[in-house]
Amino acid sequence: MTLMFTSRTAVYCSNLTTQRSAVTILRTLSGTASNGIKSRSALTAYQQNPSLRTRNFHSTSVVQAKDFFPEPDTPHIKKTKTAWPHPIYTVEQMNQVAVAHRDTRNWSDKVALIAVKLLRWGLDTVSGYKHGKAQALHAQDPQEAQKRYGMTGKQYLVRNVFLESVAGVPGMVAGMLRHLHSMRRMKRDHGWIETLLEESYNERMHLLIFLKLYEPGWFMRLAVLGAQGVFFNAMFLSYLISPRTCHRFVGYLEEEAVVTYTRELADLEAGKLPEWETLAAPDIAVDYYNLPEGHRTMKDLLLHVRADEAKHREVNHTLGNLDQNSDPNPYASKYDNPNVPHPRKDIKYLKPSGWEREEVM
């Protein structure tokens, strides 16, 4: 008797639940038909909130648009501040950045310059960049030169992503080795570590900015993996042997980076990159450089990146002029007379060939 009563109760409850579910569905459909605006708001919230898209029981995957590096799902954290705020560059200062070269003065400089030329040749070969031939043909037939050797916006972005993916290696290697050297010898480093790590961080920010404009494929990822591994180990061994040569090498390398971004700006201003003329700087660039309203174009972004590379050029040429073991870092030092030009983090007193030791010590 008890068993029969229990069975009937279960069946009744099941039917009642089914009826209530059906009524709920009908009410929902009716509400959807009469409240279109509310439905669209709910749909928007559904799309923007990943937690609402979680399905406990499913047999098919959810198709979602991919972001290259999406924001982390941390509702209680509004924003993570940068450890190294970027200095403010004026438009006049950035326009004064120019292509420059420091002449070699000893065997160490010559070794560094030869290494940079070989590296530049390899990068030009891989990316199909032939500026020398383009200039020679441009004097005879500009249209044919642009057709055969002209770079598109996408090709420049590919080159920039690859360049910036390895550009952050030298500063990290040098900062790491000096950090270990300071602990091992139980002596101060006199401010070199911070500047070197900040330089590496700045190069990584360049990479993150360009990744918002171009997403590399598997081939470039493999190329970056190999190049980064080889470059890291080469810099590691070289810095142990001659830190001065490594800083001169990076100084010459940054000279080439200034050349690259100067040519990109020239092509953009000449109308050869129409896809960049209306391209806005990514939000990550706006936040990092504090770009004001009306100065958030691709040209403004390239001006800032080129100015950064010009600053790295100066910093490494300056560090290459100093005593690697005893001299303090002039970019982390406080001078007694602030009115006299001296090394700074910004580009107010930019020196393409670096500051000589006698000028800063």
From Swiss-Prot:
Amino acid composition bias (Polar residues), ranges on this chain: 318-328
Gene3D superfamilies registered for this protein in UniProt: Alternative oxidase (1.20.1260.140)
Domain of life: Eukaryota
Recorded topology in the membrane: Multi-pass membrane protein
Location, primary (coarse class): mitochondrion
Segments of this protein annotated with the region Disordered: 318-361
One of the record's GO cellular component terms: mitochondrial inner membrane
EC number assigned by the record: 1.-.-.-
Binding-site residues, Fe cation 1: E164, E203, H206, E309
UniProt keyword list: Electron transport, Iron, Membrane, Metal-binding, Mitochondrion, Mitochondrion inner membrane, Oxidoreductase, Respiratory chain, Transit peptide, Transmembrane, Transmembrane helix, Transport
Bias kind Basic and acidic residues: ranges: 343-361
Cofactor binding summary note: Binds 2 iron ions per subunit.
Record-annotated membrane-spanning stretches: 156-178, 218-240
Pfam families tied to this protein: AOX
GO molecular function, one term: alternative oxidase activity
Binding of Fe cation 2, residues: E203, E254, E309, H312
EC category name: oxidoreductase
Compartments reported by the entry: Mitochondrion inner membrane
Cofactor(s) the protein requires to work: Fe cation
InterPro entries tied to this protein: AOX, AOX_sf
Keyword check for Methyltransferase: no
This protein's record includes keyword Iron: yes
PANTHER family, per the entry: ALTERNATIVE OXIDASE
Homology family: Belongs to the alternative oxidase family.
UniProt function note: Catalyzes cyanide-resistant oxygen consumption. May increase respiration when the cytochrome respiratory pathway is restricted, or in response to low temperatures.
Descriptive protein name: Alternative oxidase, mitochondrial
